[in-house]
Amino acid sequence: MDMGSKEVLMESPPDYSTGPRSQFRIPCCPVHLKRLLIVVVVVVLVVVVIVGALLMGLHMSQKHTEMVLEMSIGGAPETQKRLALSEHTDTIATFSIGSTGIVLYDYQRLLTAYKPAPGTYCYIMKMAPESIPSLEALARKFKNFQAKSSTPTSKLGQEEGHSAGSDSDSSGRDLAFLGLAVSTLCGELPLYYI
């Protein structure tokens, strides 16, 4: 055996590792431009994340609002379909029932008014403070009442002795007990008490 060959085997193996680690290099760019580029990229990413979060929040709040409105109008059977009487006795709430009409709750006077979409008449109904009807129940009641339009109805302000053809609005009656909201909704339309 040749001694020279043993020396070759005793040498350390060649180093195949990479050279010293250097910074991220962009050719032809000075250091201050690299830093500026990194700052701009970080700011853009932060803005994209914030805008995305805001848009998701807006979408979720819109879906939540639509779900609550859908449940209150024609929603799930497990939800409570009654409106609670507000702490404020002078609160008025107005709802549009699709294209069929407008419902107005007057919690101070405990009245519910309904004006159909064509706007030829206005229905008024008294509500009990412990049992305020839901929009769905009111819509059903008013639709049933409209379907039975051949039945005689009592105009508000008419007495039993007056004929059905007399104009009740020109009789000089005071409708202040209805309140400003109901008077504004119904205007000069004939009022029917249900």
From Swiss-Prot:
Keywords for this protein: Disulfide bond, Gaseous exchange, Lipoprotein, Palmitate, Secreted, Surface film
Keyword Lipoprotein: yes
Cellular-component GO terms for this entry: alveolar lamellar body; cytoplasm; extracellular region; extracellular space; multivesicular body
InterPro entries per record: BRICHOS_dom, SP-C, SP-C_palmitoylation_site, Surfactant_protein_propep
Other notes: Pulmonary surfactant consists of 90% lipid and 10% protein. There are 4 surfactant-associated proteins: 2 collagenous, carbohydrate-binding glycoproteins (SP-A and SP-D) and 2 small hydrophobic proteins (SP-B and SP-C).
Chain residues carrying a lipid of type S-palmitoyl cysteine: C28, C29
Domain BRICHOS: 95-194
Keyword Nucleotide-binding applies: no
Organism: Rattus norvegicus
Disulfide bridge map: C122-C186
Cellular compartments annotated: Secreted, Extracellular space, Surface film
Maturation propeptide residues: 1-23, 59-194
Pfam families: BRICHOS, SP_C-Propep
Gene Ontology terms for molecular function: identical protein binding
Gene Ontology BP, a term: response to glucose
Protein name: Surfactant protein C
Region (Disordered): 1-21, 149-170
